[in-house]
C-alpha cells in the first residue's frame, strides 16, 4: 500500500489517508511532512510550490489537490491553512538553506499573511472572524480560538525571520509589532488563570 504519487509531469503529493481524502492537504502536510523534508527536500519544496500556484487572489491557500494533481478543491475557507503554509515555507527554508526557494515563495507569504491579518476584527492582533472552519472540523470554535491564534503568532514570528533574511525590513518591523500586540492579547483573552481556554 502506498499513499504517495509522483507523476511524470514532476508533481508530487500524498493522500491525507490511505486511499481517501485529498492530496497534499495543507493541514496534514503541516503535521506530517517532516520525513519528506528530511529524506527528499526537493519533493517537499515541490509540493509547496505546486500549492502556491493555486493561491487565491485574495491570499487564501488551498486545502487539498484533486486526485490527478492538476487542480485544487474549492475549500479555501479554512483559516488555519494560511499560517500553516507560512510555517511550512519557513521550516523548509531553514532546513535546506535554499534562499532562492524563499524568494520564489515570498510573494505568496505576503499574500497569505495579509489575508489572515484581515480576520482581526477588533484590532488586538489576533484573528476573530470566520474562525470556525479549520482542521478541527468537528469542533464548534468561535471568536478567537487558541489554536488559530497560536498558529497566527507562530506564523508572524516565522514571517519576521524570513523578511529579515530577505532584507524586507518594513515588513519585518510591521509583523514584529503585530506579534508583540497579538502575544499580549493572547494571554489577556485566553488565559483563564489555570490554562488557555479553547476560545474567547
PLM regions: where:
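Aromatic-rich carbohydrate-recognition surfaces in CAZymes
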Residues: 21-126, 144-163, 176
Amino acid at each position: 500500500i502506498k499513499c504517495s504519487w509522483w507523476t511524470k509531469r514532476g508533481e508530487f503529493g500524498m493522500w491525507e489517508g490511505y486511499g481517501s481524502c485529498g492530496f497534499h492537504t495543507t493541514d496534514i502536510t503541516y503535521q506530517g511532512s517532516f520525513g519528506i523534508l528530511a529524506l527528499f527536500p526537493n519533493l517537499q519544496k515541490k509540493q509547496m510550490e505546486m500549492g502556491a500556484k493555486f493561491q487565491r487572489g485574495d491570499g487564501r491557500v488551498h486545502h487539498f489537490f484533486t486526485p490527478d494533481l492538476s487542480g485544487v478543491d474549492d475549500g479555501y475557507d479554512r483559516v488555519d491553512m494560511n499560517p500553516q503554509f507560512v510555517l511550512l515555507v519557513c521550516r523548509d527554508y531553514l532546513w535546506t538553506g535554499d534562499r532562492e526557494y524563499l524568494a520564489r515563495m515570498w510573494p505568496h507569504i505576503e499574500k497569505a499573511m495579509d489575508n489572515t491579518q484581515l480576520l482581526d476584527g477588533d484590532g488586538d492582533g489576533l484573528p476573530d472572524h470566520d474562525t470556525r472552519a479549520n482542521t478541527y472540523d468537528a469542533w464548534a470554535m468561535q471568536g478567537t480560538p487558541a489554536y488559530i491564534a497560536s498558529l497566527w503568532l507562530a506564523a508572524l514570528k516565522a514571517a519576521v525571520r524570513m523578511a529579515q533574511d530577505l532584507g524586507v525590513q518594513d515588513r519585518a518591523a510591521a509583523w514584529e509589532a503585530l506579534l508583540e500586540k497579538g502575544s499580549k492579547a493572547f494571554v489577556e483573552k485566553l488565559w483563564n488563570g489555570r490554562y488557555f481556554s479553547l476560545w474567547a
